[in-house]
Amino acid sequence: MTHDVSKYALGRIAEDKACDYLSVNGYIVLDRNWYCRFGELDIIARKNGVIVAVEVKGGKRNADYPICNITVKKLSKLTFLLKAWLHENKLNEFCIDLRIDAISVTFIPELQIRHFVGIL
């Protein structure tokens, strides 16, 4: 499936699969590919009153390895971006529970989705 797909297209497909997974598991997707001058959040979702920024990592093989690409610097940036999203949407970060998750999506040998809850 993925051998002829560009890296960008693979990322979009991975994000689509992640959104489907979140919806099936009781999350409400609030925003996708939210962008500001400092960066981008892949998915912002809510479940049980918790606002969750979800970093999606896609790859062709092994659902454990794409997650290894999330560095401490990236986690710091995700935290900053989530606060910027809250500000833009006029939500007070001190009155809302926040969390950062990651979802790893791989396609070979078959579709595999792993949800890493609360990576920060």
From Swiss-Prot:
Domain of life where this protein originates: Bacteria
Pfam families found in the cross-reference section: UPF0102
GO MF annotation terms: nucleic acid binding
InterPro entries listed in its UniProt record: Restrct_endonuc-II-like (IPR011335), tRNA_endonuc-like_dom_sf (IPR011856), UPF0102_YraN-like (IPR003509)
Family the UniProt entry places it in: Belongs to the UPF0102 family.
PANTHER family: UPF0102 PROTEIN YRAN (PTHR34039:SF1)
Name assigned to this protein: UPF0102 protein TWT_455
Organism the protein comes from: Tropheryma whipplei (strain Twist)
